[in-house]
Amino acid sequence: KGQYYFYDDVKNVRKNFFISYKGALFEGEKYLGTTDDAFEVVSIFVWVHDAMSLQGLTKEDFLYLEKEILMNYPKAKINWKNPIEQLMKEN
């Protein structure tokens, strides 16, 4: 419980990825688009399966998850769905 795990089939854009982090399960949906010279994942929507599992997580936790996602998808813009979106917009 509470461990970090990233499950993803990077070769299949149609398959969502899953992240288990500090007891919360997140899912990410990948969208293919064009960059300057290739077709790549350019947008990712991430949401949590159970909002109650977010208790105790901080903005720093979500910034860490963004960094981890960007290691696989460096060209992607990460969009969090609510309630995480609200936290990330503040400040």
Name every feature range the model reports, one short phrase each:
Residues 1-38:
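N-terminal topogenic membrane-targeting module
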Residues 29-31, 43, 81:
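A composition-driven signal for long, intrinsically disordered, charge-rich low-complexity tracts
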Residues 38-53:
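Short glycine-rich, basic-tinged beta-strand/loop micro-motifs
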Residues 50-91:
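Cytosol-/stroma-facing membrane-proximal "stalk/adaptor" domains immediately downstream
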